[in-house]
Amino acid sequence: HLHACAGTSYIWTVTERVNFHSSPAIHLIGKKAFAMANMDVGDVSLIDLYSCFPSAVELGCQELGIAEDDPRGLTITGGLPYFGGPGNNYVMHSIVTMAEKLRANPGKFGLCTGNGWYVTKHSAGIYSTKPVESDWQREDPKKYQVEIDSMPHPTVTQKPSGPAKVETYSVITDRKGKRFGLIVGRTANNSRFLANTSDDDVTLDRMMREEMLGREGQVSQEGPINLFRFA
């Protein structure tokens, strides 16, 4: 029996999101699903968090209030990277596995979540062999999607210039070992921008070795790209 469900989409354009270390959309589907089922996360016995990448699992734990070392475990299939996602259909398999495990544990409750795109589309369902005791009706997601859509979006500048700091970053390597650095940063007026770093080994090695979040520097346009130089 499906006791609760919820679905939302986060801000579609990644550069317009509030930050890169939280997911208000996951938090909202958890809030809605647990309210619909009249329970909280401590009442479920089985959990399967969508597990395309470690960061998706970490965000799920953070937003749903589940410890990363929760003794209940975070997957019932072994996780998407190991179980697989045949036909781009992993969540159907996690729901079927959940049904099998709940039939073996009558009366227990289980939570399955899913996400798609760049941790953009989110869903949650709470299941049990126990029948729903009251009238049940799915809430139209449009009624609460507005909570996400109305969140403040950072201003994104295409031509940043001047003092800036790192909001998040990555060093990307191709199959031949060629590397380049990518910065998402904030200018002095808090506008967000995208920029490359210089491609010298000293800079890229430093980015791989040290924590660069919050580091300051200068950003400017150089030809067709924005370039960020660490102070």
Regions found by a protein language model. Name each.
Residues 30-43:
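Phosphate/pyrophosphate-binding loops at sites that engage ATP/ADP/AMP, CoA/4′-phosphopantetheine
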Residues 36-39, 53, 86-106:
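Active-site-proximal alpha-helical scaffold in enzymes
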Residues 1-24, 28, 32, 96-97, ...:
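Condensing-enzyme catalytic core mediating Claisen C-C bond formation in acyl metabolism
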Residues 202-220:
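Short nucleic-acid-contacting surface segments enriched for D/E, G, S/T with interspersed K/R
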